Amino acid sequence: MYFMTKKMLTFVQTPKEGLSFAMTTYLNLFVKLLIFLYIQNTKACLSINNVNNNSKNKLRSGVSYYIINLKMSMLFTEQIVTIYNKLIF
């Protein structure tokens, strides 16, 4: 308990450590958000792939799946970068 209180006091006293603590918190939130969006992206692409697998032309469905996956990945990456920039700056 004393160690925890002492650690909290050092964060309050030295702004450099307090800033690093805040940055660590923001980075943890950013990584959690990244994992969440990656899982959502994978689920969406898998559902799109299942719809396309019912079609007759497997090659066309595979190509469209990868194109949709690439577009969604770019969209999520853009969203993540904007959220990260808002958090940090």
Swiss-Prot record:
Regions that span the bilayer: 20-39
Record localization: Membrane
Membrane topology: Single-pass membrane protein
One GO CC term on file: membrane
Main location: membrane
Keywords, sorted A to Z: Membrane, Plasmid, Transmembrane, Transmembrane helix
Full protein name: Uncharacterized membrane protein YuaP
Organism, as annotated: Escherichia coli (strain K12)
